[in-house]
C-alpha cells in the first residue's frame, strides 16, 4: 500500500456521474434519449466560477486524467504529469474537469451500455458520434456544474480537435484554447491508418457484427492488431530505433513465422494484448470515425480562417518535431488561419524524439512552455 502520494499529486480522486434526460440530437441524425457522463474534478471552483478548465481526452483516453483511485494504484491518471499542484495545469489555481466522452468504454454511455429500447447492450447499434456531438454533450456537463465559461479548454491529439471545436460551437464560453499535437482535419494517410485498424476489428470472427457481448466473447485479435498499427504511428522512427533497434529477445533466429524474435515485436504484442483486455472494440471504431469526420472548415468552403473567425478565445498551439501522425506543419496550418482571422495565438514547437505520444510525456521544454502559457491565464 502506498504510504503517501507525491507532493505535486492531486492524490485520491473519485469518479462522478451525471445523468442527462434531455435528448441529444447527433450529427448522424439519430439522438440519445438519455445518457450518462462520467467525470473527475481536481482543485476547487472559485466563487466567481472563473477558474474552470476542461481537459478533453484523445482516442483511448478517459476521465481519469490525474491522481489515483486507490492507494494500491501503480500508475496515476493519463495526464498526471501536467495536472496537479505546481504543474502546468496547476490545481492550486484551476478547477479541472476531465470526462469520458459519449461512445467511450469507461463509464459514460457507449456501446457497452444497455440500450433502453432493447434492454441489451447497444453494441454496433450505438450511433456514430462526432467531435461536435461531444462538445455539445460537454456543454451540457458544464451547465450542470454551473460553469458558464471555461478559463481554458485543453486537449492533445483528438482532444485538441475538441478544444478547437469548442471555440467554434460555443465561442462565448471559452477564454483560452490549447490544442496540442493536433490538426484541423486528418490527412488521407491518417484516415488510411484508421481504416486498417477498423478492418482488423471488423474481420475478427469474434466481432459478431459488433454484438460480441451477447456472445460472451471479445474480438481480442482484431483489437490487438488495431492497437499495434496505431501504436507504431504514435512513436517516431528515432524513438523506436533508440528503444529497440534490431535487438533480439534471444541469441538466435528461429526461422519461422510464429516466434517473437525482435524486441520491437514483443513490445507491440504486449501493447496490443494489454489494450485488447481493457478497451471496447465498438468504441475503437467510433473514436476513429470521429477523427476521420472532424473537418470544421468543410462548412466554410475549406477556409479555416473563416471557420475560426467566430472564435473569441486566445489560442496556444504546441507541436513536436518528430510527430509524423500530426506533424508540426498541421499545427502551423491552424496558427496561420488564426493569424489570418486576427486572433491572438501563441505557438511552441518542441524538439522531442518521442513522436506523437510526446504530448503525454514529462518533457521539460514542453512542461515549461505549457506552464508559461497557463500562468498567463487570469482567473
Curated annotation (Swiss-Prot):
Q: Which residues form a coiled coil?
A: none
GO BP annotation list: homoserine metabolic process; methionine biosynthetic process
Q: Which InterPro entries match?
A: AB_hydrolase_1, AB_hydrolase_fold, HAT_MetX-like
Tell me which residues make up the AB hydrolase-1 domain.
51-360
Spell out the molecular function terms from Gene Ontology.
homoserine O-acetyltransferase activity; homoserine O-succinyltransferase activity
Residues with site note (Important for acyl-CoA specificity): 325
The protein's annotated pathway: Amino-acid biosynthesis; L-methionine biosynthesis via de novo pathway; O-succinyl-L-homoserine from L-homoserine: step 1/1
Identify one Pfam family in the record.
Answer: Abhydrolase_1
**Predominant localisation class:** cytoplasm
Q: Where in the cell is it found?
A: Cytoplasm
Q: Which GO terms describe its cellular component?
A: cytoplasm
Catalytic residues, per the record, are 157, 323, 356
Q: Provide the E.C. number(s) assigned to this enzyme.
A: 2.3.1.46
Q: Where does substrate bind?
A: 227, 357
Instruction: Tell me the keywords, alphabetical order.
Output: Acyltransferase, Amino-acid biosynthesis, Cytoplasm, Methionine biosynthesis, Transferase
So what does this thing catalyse? L-homoserine + succinyl-CoA = O-succinyl-L-homoserine + CoA
User: HAMAP family from the xrefs?
Assistant: MetX_acyltransf
Q: Which family does it belong to?
A: Belongs to the AB hydrolase superfamily. MetX family.
Describe its assembly. Homodimer.
What the protein does comes down to:
Transfers a succinyl group from succinyl-CoA to L-homoserine, forming succinyl-L-homoserine.
This protein's name: Homoserine O-succinyltransferase
Amino acid at each position: 500500500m502506498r504510504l503517501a502520494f507525491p507532493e505535486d499529486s492531486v492524490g485520491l480522486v473519485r469518479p462522478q456521474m451525471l445523468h442527462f434526460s434531455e435528448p441529444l440530437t447527433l450529427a448522424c441524425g439519430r439522438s440519445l434519449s438519455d445518457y450518462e457522463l462520467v467525470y473527475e474534478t481536481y482543485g476547487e471552483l472559485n466563487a466567481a466560477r472563473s477558474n474552470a478548465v476542461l481537459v478533453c481526452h484523445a482516442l483511448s483516453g478517459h476521465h481519469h486524467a490525474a491522481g489515483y483511485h486507490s492507494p494500491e494504484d501503480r500508475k496515476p491518471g493519463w495526464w498526471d504529469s501536467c495536472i496537479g499542484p505546481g504543474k502546468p495545469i496547476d490545481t492550486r489555481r484551476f478547477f479541472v474537469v476531465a470526462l469520458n466522452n459519449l461512445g467511450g468504454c469507461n463509464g459514460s454511455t457507449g456501446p457497452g451500455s444497455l440500450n433502453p429500447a432493447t434492454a441489451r447492450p447497444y453494441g454496433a447499434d450505438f450511433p456514430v458520434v462526432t467531435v461536435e456531438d461531444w462538445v455539445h454533450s460537454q456543454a451540457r456537463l458544464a451547465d450542470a456544474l454551473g460553469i458558464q465559461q471555461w478559463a481554458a479548454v485543453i486537449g492533445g491529439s483528438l482532444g485538441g480537435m475538441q478544444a478547437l471545436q469548442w471555440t467554434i460551437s460555443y465561442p462565448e464560453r471559452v477564454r483560452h484554447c490549447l490544442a496540442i499535437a493536433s490538426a484541423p482535419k486528418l490527412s488521407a494517410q491518417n484516415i488510411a491508418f484508421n481504416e486498417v485498424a477498423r478492418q482488423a476489428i471488423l474481420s475478427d470472427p469474434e466481432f459478431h457484427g459488433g454484438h460480441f457481448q451477447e456472445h460472451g466473447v471479445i474480438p481480442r485479435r482484431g483489437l490487438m492488431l488495431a492497437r499495434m498499427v496505431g501504436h507504431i504511428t504514435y512513436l517516431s522512427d528515432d524513438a523506436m530505433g533508440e528503444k529497440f533497434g534490431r535487438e533480439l529477445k534471444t541469441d538466435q533466429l528461429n526461422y519461422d513465422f510464429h516466434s517473437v524474435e525482435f524486441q520491437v515485436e514483443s513490445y507491440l504484442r504486449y501493447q496490443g494484448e494489454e489494450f485488447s483486455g481493457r478497451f471496447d472494440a465498438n468504441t475503437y471504431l467510433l473514436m476513429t470515425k470521429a477523427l476521420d469526420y472532424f473537418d470544421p472548415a468543410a462548412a466554410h468552403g475549406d477556409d479555416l480562417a473563416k471557420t475560426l473567425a467566430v472564435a473569441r478565445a486566445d489560442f496556444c498551439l504546441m507541436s513536436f518535431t518528430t510527430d509524423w501522425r500530426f506533424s508540426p506543419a498541421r499545427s502551423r496550418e491552424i496558427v496561420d488561419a488564426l493569424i489570418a482571422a486576427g486572433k491572438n495565438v501563441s505557438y511552441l514547437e518542441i524538439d522531442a524524439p518521442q513522436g506523437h505520444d510526446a504530448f503525454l510525456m514529462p518533457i521539460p521544454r514542453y512542461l515549461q512552455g505549457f506552464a508559461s502559457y497557463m500562468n498567463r491565464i487570469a482567473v
